[in-house]
């Protein structure tokens, strides 16, 4: 066999699941749930009693963590729901490009250049304003199910 037969395409994704199962009856307010394929934060849970024909049901009201849309779902409490793996990571802001992308410094010293400026006006103004004033900013990035978005900004002082 030649060396060429052993080459394979490496993927950025290690094959880990983007969600994990959790019984509907154990999901609480402020937890996370996948509704209609979107990662959401639960804002309200109500449980109906077991009826004559079936299981107790959980009624979830949740907000999409990326686009803030309200979604609802009703699931039997004994069934499993998908729960997204949600990570929040802080990065230091290095630069803002003219095309609306940010350049961020990761913990290991590399740069991350694939994130757009936030669409939320308040957050956008905080990031742009602070950067123009020469402040050292740390941006919190929320990631779930293959999506990433800037969700918060912290001022850690002025640049020296």
Swiss-Prot record:
Entry's Gene Ontology molecular function annotations: ribosome binding; RNA binding; translation elongation factor activity; translation initiation factor activity
CDD domains the record matches: S1_eIF5A
InterPro entries reported in the protein's UniProt record: IF5A-like, IF5A-like_N, NA-bd_OB-fold, Rib_uL2_dom2, Trans_elong_IF5A_hypusine_site, Transl_elong_IF5A_C, Translation_prot_SH3-like_sf
Keyword Protein biosynthesis in record: yes
SUPFAM superfamilies reported in the protein's UniProt record: Nucleic acid-binding proteins, Translation proteins SH3-like domain
Assigned keywords, A-Z: Hypusine, Initiation factor, Protein biosynthesis
Stretches for region Disordered: 1-21
Pfam families named in the record: eIF-5a, IF5A-like_N
Biased composition, class Basic and acidic residues, residue ranges: 1-12
Residues with Hypusine modification: 52
GO BP term, example: positive regulation of translational termination
Post-translational note: Lys-52 undergoes hypusination, a unique post-translational modification that consists in the addition of a butylamino group from spermidine to lysine side chain, leading to the formation of the unusual amino acid hypusine. eIF-5As are the only known proteins to undergo this modification, which is essential for their function.
Protein family: Belongs to the eIF-5A family.
Function, in words: Translation factor that promotes translation elongation and termination, particularly upon ribosome stalling at specific amino acid sequence contexts. Binds between the exit (E) and peptidyl (P) site of the ribosome and promotes rescue of stalled ribosome: specifically required for efficient translation of polyproline-containing peptides as well as other motifs that stall the ribosome. Acts as a ribosome quality control (RQC) cofactor by joining the RQC complex to facilitate peptidyl transfer during CAT tailing step.
NCBIfam families cross-referenced by the UniProt entry: eIF_5A (TIGR00037)
The protein's name: Eukaryotic translation initiation factor 5A-4
